[in-house]
Amino acid sequence: MSKIASVDAPSFSFLFDGKKSSDLLPQWSGKVRTRSLDSLRQQETTTWTDRTSGLEVRCVAVRYSDFPAIEWTVYLKNTSHKDTPIVENFQAMESSFPCPESDDFVLHHNVGSPADGNDYRPIETSMTANTKLHFGGAGGRPTNSDMSYFNFAWGNQGKIVVVGWPGQWAADFTRVGSRELAIRAGQEQTHFKLHPGEEVRTPLMVVMNWQGDWIKGQNQWRRWMMAHGMPKPGGKLPTPMLLASSGRAYGEMIGANEANQIMHIDRYLEEGLKLDYWWMDAGWYVQNQGWPQVGTWEVDRKRFPKGFKPISDHGHAKGVKTLVWFEPERVAANTWISDNHPEWLLSPLSGLESRRSTQLGIPEPCVVFNRNDHAIDYNGIHWDAKSIAFHPGPKGEYSVVRFTAPKEGTYKVRGVFQGIDNLTTTDVHIFVNGKSVFDSFIQLEGLGKRVEADHTVELRNGEVCDFVVGNGNGNYAYDSTGLQATLTGPDGIAHDAAKEYGARDVAWTYGYLTPGKVPNSETFRPYDQINKDAAGSNSLFNLGNPVAWKWLVEHVDKLLIDNGIDLYRQDFNIDPLSFWRGNDAPDRQGITENKHIVGYLAYWDELRKRHPNMLIDSCASGGRRNDLETMRRSVPLWRSDYAYEPIGHQCMTYGISMWLPFHGTGTVADETAPYYGGGVTPIHSYAFWSNAAPSLGSGIDIREKGIDYPKLRKLIANWRTLGSYYYGDYYPLTPCTRQDDNWIAWQFDRPEKNDGVVQAFRRPKSPDSQIRLKLRGLLPEARYRISVLEGASDRDGKEVSGKELAEVGLPVNLVEQPGAAVIRYAKVGPV
């Protein structure tokens, strides 16, 4: 491909000790080193060093000779023997570009993978003068909400900008006036000092220019991905693959064992369904609470006495490889890792101490204290540094912070109750010796999130003052309430609940009151359990910990080898952001995330180095980690946890194909199939083709011999024919909508071979039995022969000119409602 537009230069920014990098770098010593990576890639490394602080800035850029594209990553390293000043707002890209003074300026972008049927939905946003747009990761997973791939189009040209960061990225696009586009992108939160020898990096940025229409830009991107942005095990791009598992029938792998896995493989082959991979998903390891209890990464020898090797050997002997699921980053309680190496784990609530009752046996009611010198934000709750909060129980238990008077006299009581959850709605009280002196509400009865009380009371030695939180409107959820409580005694000493928290020989105790219409101090029962880190059931394996990282590499590598595993599948069913940020000090914000991301990418690079022919499958509750850095190392074989439903998956193929040439999903060939289940299910062509993708996983219950296997064999044979076209140029032929009274269609075209394929779907309530589809990428003067794989049989064998197919359109007739058509075309000669 020839160079069709000038390539941009890297542009990044940060503040260092309050000064702009754009002002600092010209003053620092710099050098440039250029080297050829291969015949198509030139690497340019520019380094600046501040001799005063020892901060080294290194920008590593790669320019491509076969595409008008550039990529870069920026690294910061402390080369001194002392901490650096603060680095903040470390942006991988901060740049602006001239654009025409026209309203014809559009951003093409896509939804991420929220698993709600809107996954990968394409969006077209007009960027008129002064438009400001913000995109980013959600919860620390990069494509939870937004895809991190963007195409700006104006006139007959445009620019693709892609952020590669498997964490919490953020991007802001601003049309400054009408003649400039400003772009700012990077890790969302950075404010840190670097320790001696420490290094961090930005997200990977890719900028690609294109000319023509925006779809041409998308296809230029697809070709770049295939050339430079996808894994190539054994030096080759992944080929379309048919996989199968028994997960629907056995609750993932909970009900699986050696015998039934071998039986399932044999049954597929018995029915003439040649598999590329046998897929063994979650639940194969030691656990006693179901598949989510991950953290003991050993094959359950009760069900698999010799591990997976007998299954792998059996499959290999019959030409079937094995895929096995892992989820190393999430660690559940009561597992080998959590019990033996808690120092390898991150809690989102590190430093948050919780007091609760073992008699109740539940997390709430409780009193919580943030021991940290910094605030903690988690799931919408904000704990100030060195602060107390409390929470009622699910059955109406009141939570109490109790003061016991050390001497007789007059006490000044001050209480401040603050809702610290976004949705706190509760009642609060102050009781003295069982009698109320203050009753109020948080965000109920017209009151706000904060109420205050000041009283003067008489207390004898040993008498009590209770600060109480209830469940307000009868719903205890979200009722985390901050408390500032102070009693100043007759001696002038101020007893502060937060400052004296947990100290011996002081006046404060913590407990709960039994449920009732009003608090009854006589029912006070002290909390008898202290949790130093109030973590939930899951922790995050810290891939930024070198010791933990080394153990994981060696352990997983051994599992792969010993069990004959051919394809490594990694899931990620947890939002890591609160774990990262909960472990950052105020002057180290962003460091935990950065080190985890670097460790994650290095972990995969090491596995790929040790297993050069092995493909990696990236899953994160479906497709929630499909950023470019991840996609360079893996493919998403399960693109969404929204499974099987035809219309949603039609739209997914439509949207994701704009950016990722290879992706996968599963099928039962039945639009009514539940996520889990077994038994005989019908084989519907419409459902099958709606879920067809470059990688296709079968979820049918192969134990059942009453399934229509002849029909399924034909569908799979035709799908394998279709598979050869997925790496062609992609053209959407209709708008993308989830309405059930429409058609949807797209085209994959191979210009090098002058052929292609069209897929079209008539949805259940579409009143039209025919649609005309104007094809793209054809030679007007050429003649094309039509061949039908599915539906629209009236077109089979016809020959049509490229001009007619492009200008008049290919007529597709479907009597079936719903129905699917798969139509090939190939050049046979001139008109």
Language model: regions and residue ranges:
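Polysaccharide-binding surfaces and accessory modules of carbohydrate-active proteins
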Residues: 1-179, 188-190, 783-796
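Short, acidic/polar linear motifs in exposed loop/turn regions
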Residues: 79-82, 421, 764, 779
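Short Pro-Gly-centered flexible turn/kink motifs
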Residues: 192-211, 818-825
